[in-house]
Amino acid sequence: MGARARGEISRKQLLAAEQAALRDTIALFDCTGSPVITDGEQTKPSFATYPLSGLGNLAADGLTIPFADGNTRQLRRLASGPFHYGVHAVTYLKTAQTYARHPLKQAVISSSALSLLYPRLRRNGR
């Protein structure tokens, strides 16, 4: 995804790489014998912000979420409304199902986490 963002590969090349990673991940999970597997979120740009892909009403100066391991995730800020999903989790599930032989679970970001996109509103001069 970084190579695509830097213009080093085409969208078609990125999609091919994503699909290869997805097929490999699902095949490896299948080998574990687990009755339910996951797609490993291989094709999501971010576990927290995948629903925002393609939206044009976001600004870059949103909340930063720190993690215990020292990593951070910078959320975008909703610059204008209304909010809507750019991509739904079912899109990732349907793609993964084309490769899976076992039931899949799909990670979905909570609506409460997405509420962090909304700018803080000033009340009573604060």
Language-model features: locations:
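Domain-level signal for soluble alpha/beta catalytic cores
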Residues: M1-R126
